[in-house]
């Protein structure tokens, strides 16, 4: 019986390697060819604007000290402690400070390491806003919305500081994106995901995160394709319950932890 030698696959040509390199940068088949390159270029420009001079940026010293303390102790990290002894907590929930503390734990205490999370959050917000608007109004409208957000002066300012607004905005835009997906499909799962995002936003800026709830709920009640209003109301109620559970999770956990004295 003749033995047929295995034929090694031909090495990829330069053209095929180039096509594979370009694939992530090309728009999906259902979008114009210019959509993804334009979005990525805009995100890159936003990133440059946000990081420009961030090593010498002014930061809030109170929250900077808290993030540093939290980066040095997991106990302080969990409880959002301001001081290394873990006796004083900050004046809000520590959602954004958790992200900053992780950055400091990885890179060390530097101003740029303190601001880096907000830069990333700002760029992600631009990308997610594009997707949310594109779902309902198309790529051109999505790109316009993303461009306006990217160049708004307050967006640049927040992305170059260490306050918690950047994380709040990102999470609420993620909630809006999930709600837009629910509007198109009537998906309860997407609406529950929106509730999770709002609950996480509560960890960043507390009750301010809930200000978006009436608009998100009204949009789903009025425009979702679910056949019966009763069904849509039930979906909104479940999403509200998820939001409440996620929002109150950290406060509940901290409240249930006994004090050192056991009292």
What are these regions (language model features)?
Residues 116-136:
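Transmembrane-helix motifs of polytopic, lipid-linked glycan transferases
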Residues 21, 26, 59-69, 73, ...:
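Transmembrane-lumen/periplasm boundary regions of multi-pass, lipid-linked membrane glycan transferases
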Residues 40-45, 129-151:
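Transmembrane-helix signature of polytopic, membrane-embedded enzymes
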Residues 154, 160-167, 206-207:
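Short acidic/glycine- and proline-prone juxtamembrane loop motifs at membrane-interface regions
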Residues 190-205:
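Membrane-interface alpha helices of multi-pass inner-membrane proteins
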Residues 9, 140, 175-191:
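Membrane-interface transmembrane helices that cradle and orient dolichyl/undecaprenyl
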Residues 62-106:
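Extracytosolic helix-loop segments that constitute the early lumenal/periplasmic catalytic or substrate-binding loops
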Residues 1-49, 235-243:
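Start-transfer (signal-anchor) and selected internal transmembrane alpha helices
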